[in-house]
Swiss-Prot record:
Binds 1 Mg(2+) ion per subunit. Residues 227-247 are annotated as: Linker. This is Bifunctional protein GlmU. It is an enzyme of class 2 (transferase). The gene is glmU. The lineage of its organism: Bacteria, Bacillati, Cyanobacteriota, Cyanophyceae, Nostocales. GO terms for biological process: cell morphogenesis; cell wall organization; lipid A biosynthetic process; peptidoglycan biosynthetic process; regulation of cell shape; UDP-N-acetylglucosamine biosynthetic process.
């Protein structure tokens, strides 16, 4: 049985931000959410987040995560002081306590499982995660014997010049037998350069403590500033992109592509440069995305093409072509075999199968039938200044260039709208609509106009 405690009370001053450090986003999730996610496969009996700086904001940001407990550290006096706040909440607990910093977003569940197994097999009072770094600057040092039993732990700022030569560092992940730690916590002293209560001071007081090295140093990258945040994002993206390329997805110029972990891709999808896939996006086999496109929270069926376009909260059926320079947003549904072309915006709109909107159009709050052709420059005037109104366009209807459809409006099946028309009334099936001024031609008007102006000037 294990209880998890996540340290999320610090401000993170080096981030230079009003936002608490643990709430900074990495690939669509906050740092602390990623840590919480990493402990889920361990099936902990309780998950406790220790909050402090802007605690209400931190708690609000995680309100949707079920069965999460919060304990407040009103004054931030170090990691040991943070764990002291758990004493009244774990009075009768006799199991293990796994402690992680809330700024370790790349830690893997497998690493934590291995650490817990080592802890149990060796009946340790405590087990800590360590690593060897070529440049350990900024990390606390761990000193062990040949059997990886910890002899001493020293924070970087408290290290002597000789101690700083040690490259074995504390990764900020601990597993304690809680009863042993609970006895030591009240007696911690702030005898250090920071005048803080260090959890590391408790390590050598609880009994046998073993160090376990992490295999991949990238997992223990702590996020203290924007540079480290960017580095973590690069590592995360490398993991994601390698996964999909090995699964049969082609990424052309992977360095210029970003893919959230929540995205699902099928084999034989091709992603061109400068394309960004975000949120709960699913792209099925044979689709070709990019270059220069953003797909967010959208589902694309087989053999869809998207070029230089933005697709958000939309569904696109098989064989449809989007772009270049199209914008789909607000729960758009595009049927099979459609074309949404140059400078077309769709908002909260449904297109039937084999419907085309190829050029320079805005279609909003509209249901469009099958085999409809939206002429260049067609606009749905759906907003009256107070409310947005719906438009319905029947099957096989064709709108001429530069048409304006003033909602609320219903066009039946097989309707033809003449170019330049402004349509304000419902149109029945099989109708032709001409809603524009009659053309008037005045021969020689320009010559007469010039002559009149010349005469006026000589008066």
């Amino acid at each position: 049985m294990v209880v998890v405690a996540i340290l999320a009370a610090g401000r993170g001053t080096r981030m230079k931000s009003r936002l608490p450090k643990v709430l900074h986003s990495l690939g669509g999730q906050s740092l602390v959410e990623r840590v919480i996610e990493s402990v889920e496969p361990l099936s902990p009996s309780r998950r406790i987040v220790i909050v402090g700086y802007q605690s209400e904001e931190v708690q609000t940001a995680m309100h949707s995560i079920p069965n999460l407990e919060f304990v407040e550290q009103t004054v931030q006096l170090g990691t040991g002081h943070a764990i002291q706040q758990l004493l009244p909440h774990l009075k009768d607990y006799t199991g293990d306590l796994l402690i992680l910093n809330g700024d370790l977003p790349l830690i893997r569940s497998e690493t934590l499982k291995q650490m817990l197994q080592t802890h149990a097999q060796n009946q340790n009072a405590a087990t800590i995660l360590t690593s060897h770094l070529p440049d350990p600057t900024g990390y606390g040092r761990v000193f062990c014997n040949n059997e990886n039993i910890v002899q001493q732990m020293v924070e970087h700022k408290d290290c002597t010049a000789a101690q700083r030569q040690n490259q074995r560092i504390n990764a900020g992940v601990y597993c304690f037998r809680w009863p042993d730690l609970a006895k030591v916590l009240p007696h911690l002293q702030a005898n250090n350069a920071q005048k803080e209560y260090y959890l590391t001071d408790a390590v050598t007081q609880v009994g046998q403590v073993m160090a376990v090295d992490v295999e991949d140093n990238q997992e223990i990258l702590g996020i203290n500033d924007r540079l480290q945040l960017a580095t973590a994002y690069e590592i995360l993206q490398k993991r994601v992109k390698e996964k999909w390329m090995l699964a049969g997805v082609t990424l052309i110029d992977p360095a210029s592509i970003t893919i959230d972990e929540t995205v699902e891709l099928q084999p034989d999808v091709i992603i061109e440069p400068q394309t960004h896939l975000r949120g709960n996006t699913v792209i099925q086999t044979g689709s070709h995305i990019g270059p220069g496109s953003l797909i967010e929270n959208s589902q694309l069926a087989e053999n869809v093409t998207v070029q230089y376009s933005v697709v958000i909260d939309s569904t696109i059926q098989a064989g449809s072509r989007i772009g270049p320079y199209a914008h789909l947003r607000g729960h758009v549904q595009v049927g099979a075999g459609c074309r949404v072309g140059n400078f077309v915006e769709l908002k909260n709109t449904q297109l039937g199968d084999r419907t085309n909107a190829a050029h320079l159009s805005y279609i909003g709050d509209t249901v469009v039938g099958n085999q409809v052709n939206i002429g260049a420059g067609t606009i749905t005037a759906n907003y009256d200044g107070v409310k947005k109104h719906r438009t319905k366009i029947g099957d096989r209807t064709k709108t001429g260039a530069n048409s304006v459809l003033v909602a609320p409006l219903t066009l039946g099946d097989d309707v033809y709208i003449a170019a330049g028309s402004t349509v304000t009334e419902d149109v029945p099936n099989d109708s032709l609509v001409i809603a524009r001024s009659r053309q008037v031609v005045k021969p020689a008007w320009q010559r007469k106009s010039v002559e009149n102006k010349t005469t006026d000037q000589h008066k």
